[in-house]
Amino acid sequence: MRTSYLLLFTLCLLLSEMASGGNFLTGLGHRSDHYNCVSSGGQCLYSACPIFTKIQGTCYRGKAKCCK
């Protein structure tokens, strides 16, 4: 009987998370923009990109630039 209540509670939590936008569930498996920048050979900078580099994206949820 306790198992069925636990399963029902878990199901309710998952459904409420999906109804609110599902940020937790969709965030699983996604890499941060900082990780993507650094792993592709870039640098995350808050200031302008150095000479001979270009902006390749963003870092820290759009607060910095990925320079490569």
From Swiss-Prot:
Q: Which domain of life is it from?
A: Eukaryota
Compartments in which it is found: Secreted; Membrane
Q: Which GO terms describe its molecular function?
A: CCR6 chemokine receptor binding; identical protein binding
Q: Which UniProt keywords apply?
A: Antibiotic, Antimicrobial, Defensin, Disulfide bond, Membrane, Secreted, Signal
Signal peptide feature range: 1-21
From the record, give the cysteines joined by S-S bonds. Answer: C37-C66, C44-C59, C49-C67
Principal localisation: secreted
| Pfam families in the cross-refs | Defensin_beta
Instruction: Report quaternary structure and partners.
Output: Monomer. Homodimer.
Give the family from UniProt: Belongs to the beta-defensin family.
Q: Main role?
A: Has bactericidal activity. May act as a ligand for C-C chemokine receptor CCR6. Positively regulates the sperm motility and bactericidal activity in a CCR6-dependent manner. Binds to CCR6 and triggers Ca2+ mobilization in the sperm which is important for its motility.
What's the protein called, per UniProt?
Answer: Beta-defensin 1
What organism is listed for this UniProt entry? Homo sapiens
